From Swiss-Prot:
SUPFAM superfamilies: Cell growth inhibitor/plasmid maintenance toxic component. Is rather robust, being able to refold back into its native structure after being heated to 80 degrees Celsius. This is Uncharacterized protein Rv2302. Pfam families: DUF1918 (PF08940). Coiled coil: none annotated. To M.leprae U650M. InterPro entries: DUF1918 (IPR015035). Monomer. GO terms for cellular component: peptidoglycan-based cell wall.
Length: 80
């Protein structure tokens, strides 16, 4: 797993009651882009250092925005 500042970390929900968790990567603590990452969780703005597990993926800001647009379209809402 490799990331850069501005990418997003998405931790996949494991059940229908537990939704995916999204965080913006605001700091990468290694020169090669590997974990740990300092992230800001979108749901509450909390910042923390994470070592992502196998249930997490890194996506670019563009990929994240496109996924949000698709999700909003499925839900019948306009993406912002």
């Amino acid at each position: 797993m490799h990331a850069k500042v501005g990418d997003y970390l998405v931790v996949k929900g494991t059940t229908t009651e537990r939704h995916d968790q999204h965080a913006e990567i605001i700091e990468v603590r290694s020169a090669d882009g590997s974990p740990p990452y300092v992230v800001r969780w979108l749901v509450n703005g909390h910042e923390t250092t994470v070592y992502p597990g196998s249930d997490a993926v890194v996506v670019t800001a563009t990929e994240h925005a496109e996924a949000e647009k698709r999700a909003a379209a499925r839900a019948g809402h306009a993406a912002t």
